[in-house]
């Protein structure tokens, strides 16, 4: 079985990615298990940040690396929190504070203007200098609630409502969420390529 390092220190992302990749003939290893620290995300786009993370993890471990960079894009806030979703309310990352700041910023915004989407970019590098990284993107359309709902998931899940199911991401069971999410869409785009790679 081939090894693949997941370049993330976010426990919620790691759990989701591991579940989504479970059917592949790969041994998935979190970067923390290999002593790889998080690297500063200094890119100006989701793609740049994902490449930075994957390149760092691959360089330190010598293994192929998969990295995700994602965020919540809210139309009424001109795309915020966007690239800075994890640090929207400041550092260190605090999901409760981020959600509170978002709901405060959205106070008084009518229902028809509360559209948002989760967006993810997933990058696969076969080695640190890989000149042709595999890049896939995915999005999940929804709206922002007026108050948090649900106990599942992480991050902005309690305030992101899927209009088709009428549930927030935090109210969904993991099987449903892992089928609909922005990461699931991006991974589905990438998955068939993983089978053909010499990892």
UniProtKB/Swiss-Prot annotation:
One of its GO terms (molecular function) is ribonucleoside triphosphate phosphatase activity. SUPFAM superfamilies: ITPase-like. Mg(2+) binds at residue 69. It holds the Pfam family Ham1p_like. CDD domains: HAM1. It catalyses: XTP + H2O = XMP + diphosphate + H(+); dITP + H2O = dIMP + diphosphate + H(+); ITP + H2O = IMP + diphosphate + H(+). Its EC number is 3.6.1.66. This is dITP/XTP pyrophosphatase. Pyrophosphatase that catalyzes the hydrolysis of nucleoside triphosphates to their monophosphate derivatives, with a high preference for the non-canonical purine nucleotides XTP (xanthosine triphosphate), dITP (deoxyinosine triphosphate) and ITP. Seems to function as a house-cleaning enzyme that removes non-canonical purine nucleotides from the nucleotide pool, thus preventing their incorporation into DNA/RNA and avoiding chromosomal lesions.
């Amino acid at each position: 079985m081939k090894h693949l390092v997941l370049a993330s220190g976010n426990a919620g992302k790691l759990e989701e990615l591991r579940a989504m990749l479970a059917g592949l003939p790969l041994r998935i290893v979190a970067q923390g298990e290999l002593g790889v620290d998080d690297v500063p995300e200094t890119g100006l786009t989701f793609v740049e940040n994902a490449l930075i993370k994957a390149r760092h993890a691959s360089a330190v471990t010598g293994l192929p690396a998969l990295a995700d960079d994602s965020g919540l894009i809210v139309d009424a806030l001109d795309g915020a929190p966007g690239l800075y979703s994890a640090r929207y309310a400041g550092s260190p990352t605090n999901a409760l504070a981020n959600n509170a700041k978002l709901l405060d910023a959205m106070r008084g915004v009518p229902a028809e203007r509360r559209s948002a989407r989760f967006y993810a970019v997933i990058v696969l590098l076969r080695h640190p200098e890989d000149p042709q990284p595999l890049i896939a993107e995915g999005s999940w359309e929804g709206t922002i609630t007026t108050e948090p709902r649900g106990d599942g998931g992480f991050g902005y899940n309690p305030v992101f409502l899927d209009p088709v199911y009428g549930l927030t991401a935090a109210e969904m069971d993991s099987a449903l969420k892992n089928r609909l999410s922005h990461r699931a869409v991006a991974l589905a785009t990438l998955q068939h390529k993983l089978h053909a790679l010499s990892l």
